[in-house]
């Protein structure tokens, strides 16, 4: 298998959405589709922002994985940025082939290039396999995570 990790292109969007659906369908079954125009608009915003890196893993011409790195500037930490990972997913049929590790190696390279003092991600509590994967690659559990939907009634 010939594997390349590269920046996502607009032509990749349909396959990216399929991959993200593998994660969203199992973790967020009540999420609604935002619509094609919204998806394309958001993709273009991400692609135009030099602090964001939407990556894909291309195996023999097929997109089989993705991850989104956002570089966030900070006033603390000697004004060094941090990197936040979102939407890390490898096609279920392609797992355990080094694809996720290849995506994360590229994320680490980009973070070093950007001068990030750390990388962070969150993973749903129920994703035990993902937790083991990150641990095997040297990621450490360092914080408790909390989330809140801003529009939710209190």
Functional labels for PLM-detected ranges:
Residues 1-14, 153-154:
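Conserved N-terminal entry element of GNAT/NAT acetyltransferase domains
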Residues 24-42:
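Conserved GNAT-fold acetyl-CoA-binding loop/helix
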Residues 44-56, 84, 140:
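A short helix-loop-beta-strand connector motif used in the catalytic cores of GNAT acetyltransferases and
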Residues 56, 62-71, 89:
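Conserved beta-strand in the GNAT
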Residues 74-85, 95, 142:
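A conserved beta-turn-beta hairpin within the catalytic core of GNAT-like acetyltransferases
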Residues 85, 119-123:
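Conserved hydrophobic beta-strand within the GNAT/NAT acetyltransferase core sheet
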Residues 86-90, 96-109, 136:
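Conserved acetyl-CoA-binding loop-helix of GNAT-fold acetyltransferases
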Residues 101, 113, 117, 125-144, ...:
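Conserved active-site alpha-helix within GNAT-family acetyltransferase domains
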